[in-house]
Amino acid sequence: MQNRKMTQCEERLLEFLINKASIKVTGDWKENLIVSPMDDGNMGSLYLSLSNEMDTKRLFGEQISECHFVDSDGIDVIASLNIDKNGKLFELDIWKTDYTPLKRIPKKFDTNML
């Protein structure tokens, strides 16, 4: 898949998950983050890497935060933020519970869900 900058909606979701996880990321992460869509049936999952740390041999470390939201068609969605073995941002894993393509990322996220 093609590397690109994240969209505003993706940035909003990532910022929410990063803040929820209370991890430290560089102050310029928004400017330097490169995303690559995962082959997940268009549910919205992304590989994450900072532009100065492009490495294809990174390994999953752990999930550090997640949130739940409802897509515009009423289907539940779970978004998880994962880091690699070195503690760097690794994946935004989005799972729409009926496996259909994600329609939208909401403007706000409920901190009481999940």
Per-range role (PLM):
Residues H68:
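Short gly/ser-rich anion-binding loops that grip negatively charged ligand groups
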